[in-house]
C-alpha cells in the first residue's frame, strides 16, 4: 500500500529529539512517520457489553389505536386546547431548565442510574404499585404521613431537569413496558406527562416507537372502560391526543367532532 506521506530520507540534526515539538516541515513529517510506525496493524476495541442497550433494533408497529367507544372520544377543540397547554409547558420547562437543575434535591431523593430499570420503577411509582399493594397499604396505616418510597416521587422540576435525553427515553421505556401489563394509575400518568414534556424534537427512533406504543395501550384500556365517567378516560384521551396531535402521529389521533 502506498504511503500517504511518502517522505524520503532527509538529513536531520544529530540532536534531533522526536519527543519535542517539530521545528521544521521535515521534522514534522518525520515525527508523523515515527508515530505511524508505532501504531499496531490491527486494533481490537474493548467493548463493555453492559453498556450496550438490550434492543439494538427498533421495531415500529404501524397498527393504529383502537377506536374510542361511543361518547368517549374528545372533541377536536378539547384536543387543540390540550396541545396548546402542553406546548406551553414544554417551552416553560426548556426556558427554566437551568434554574431548576441548580436547585438542590431534598435529602431523601436519590435518583437511580439510567440503566437501573427496577429502581426507576420504584422511584416513579412507589412500592405500592411496584410490589405488594396490600402489604404496603397495611404498612401505611401503621406509619401515617407521606412516605415517597412507598408512593413514589412526583416528577418535580428539580428532578426531571436533571435527566438527560438518554435517561428520559430509558425511563419512558421502563414505564411504558410496565403499563403494557397493568392498568392506568395517577402516579403513572404524572410521570408519563412529565417525560413527554422533556422529549426533544425531532424524536429519536426509540422515542418514536415508545410514544406510539403508549397511545395504543391507552386506547386498549379506554376500550375496556365501562362508563365514560370513569376517572381514567380523560388522561387516556390526553395521551392519545398528545401523541397523535402534538407529536404528529396522525394515524393514532382521535378524529373528534369540531365542538
From Swiss-Prot:
InterPro entries assigned to the protein according to its UniProt record, in alphabetical order: GEMIN2, Gemin2/Brr1
Keyword Acyltransferase: no
Domain of life: Eukaryota
Matches recorded under Gene3D superfamilies: 1.20.5.220, 1.20.58.1070
Location, primary (coarse class): nucleus
One of the protein's GO biological processes: spliceosomal complex assembly
Pfam family for this entry, one: SIP1
Gene Ontology cellular component terms for the protein in this record: cytosol; Gemini of Cajal bodies; nucleus; SMN complex; SMN-Sm protein complex; spliceosomal complex
Subcellular location: Nucleus, Gem; Cytoplasm
Keywords associated with the record: Cytoplasm, mRNA processing, mRNA splicing, Nucleus
Quaternary structure, from the entry: Forms a stable heteromeric complex with survival of motor neuron protein (SMN), GEMIN3 and GEMIN4. The SMN complex is associated with the spliceosomal snRNAs U1 and U5 in the cytoplasm of oocytes.
Primary role: The SMN complex catalyzes the assembly of small nuclear ribonucleoproteins (snRNPs), the building blocks of the spliceosome, and thereby plays an important role in the splicing of cellular pre-mRNAs. Most spliceosomal snRNPs contain a common set of Sm proteins SNRPB, SNRPD1, SNRPD2, SNRPD3, SNRPE, SNRPF and SNRPG that assemble in a heptameric protein ring on the Sm site of the small nuclear RNA to form the core snRNP (Sm core).
The family this protein is said to belong to: Belongs to the gemin-2 family.
Protein name in the entry: Gem-associated protein 2
Amino acid at each position: 500500500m502506498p504511503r500517504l506521506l511518502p517522505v524520503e530520507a532527509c538529513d536531520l540534526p544529530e540532536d534531533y529529539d522526536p519527543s519535542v515539538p517539530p521545528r521544521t516541515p521535515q521534522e514534522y513529517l518525520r515525527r508523523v512517520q515515527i508515530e505511524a510506525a508505532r501504531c499496531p496493524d490491527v486494533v481490537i476495541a474493548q467493548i463493555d457489553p453492559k453498556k450496550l442497550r438490550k434492543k439494538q433494533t427498533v421495531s415500529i408497529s404501524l397498527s393504529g389505536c383502537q377506536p374510542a367507544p361511543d361518547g368517549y372520544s374528545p372533541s377536536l377543540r378539547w384536543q387543540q386546547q390540550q396541545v396548546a397547554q402542553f406546548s406551553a409547558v414544554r417551552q416553560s420547562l426548556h426556558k427554566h431548565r437551568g434554574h431548576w437543575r441548580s436547585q438542590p434535591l431534598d435529602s431523601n431523593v436519590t435518583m437511580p442510574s439510567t440503566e437501573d430499570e427496577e429502581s426507576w420503577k420504584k422511584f416513579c411509582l412507589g412500592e405500592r404499585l411496584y410490589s405488594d399493594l396490600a402489604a404496603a397499604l397495611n404498612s401505611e396505616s401503621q406509619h401515617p404521613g407521606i412516605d415517597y418510597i412507598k408512593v413514589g416521587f412526583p416528577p418535580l422540576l428539580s428532578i426531571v431537569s436533571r435527566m438527560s435525553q438518554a435517561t428520559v427515553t430509558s425511563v419512558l421505556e421502563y414505564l411504558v413496558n410496565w403499563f403494557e401489563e397493568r392498568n392506568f394509575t395517577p402516579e403513572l400518568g404524572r410521570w408519563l406527562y412529565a417525560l413527554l414534556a422533556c422529549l426533544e424534537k425531532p424524536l429519536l427512533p426509540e422515542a418514536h416507537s415508545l410514544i406510539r406504543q403508549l397511545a395504543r395501550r391507552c386506547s386498549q384500556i379506554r376500550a375496556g372502560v365501562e362508563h365514560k365517567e370513569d376517572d381514567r378516560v380523560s388522561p387516556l384521551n390526553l395521551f392519545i391526543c398528545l401523541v397523535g396531535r402534538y407529536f404528529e402521529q396522525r394515524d393514532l389521533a382521535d378524529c373528534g367532532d369540531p365542538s
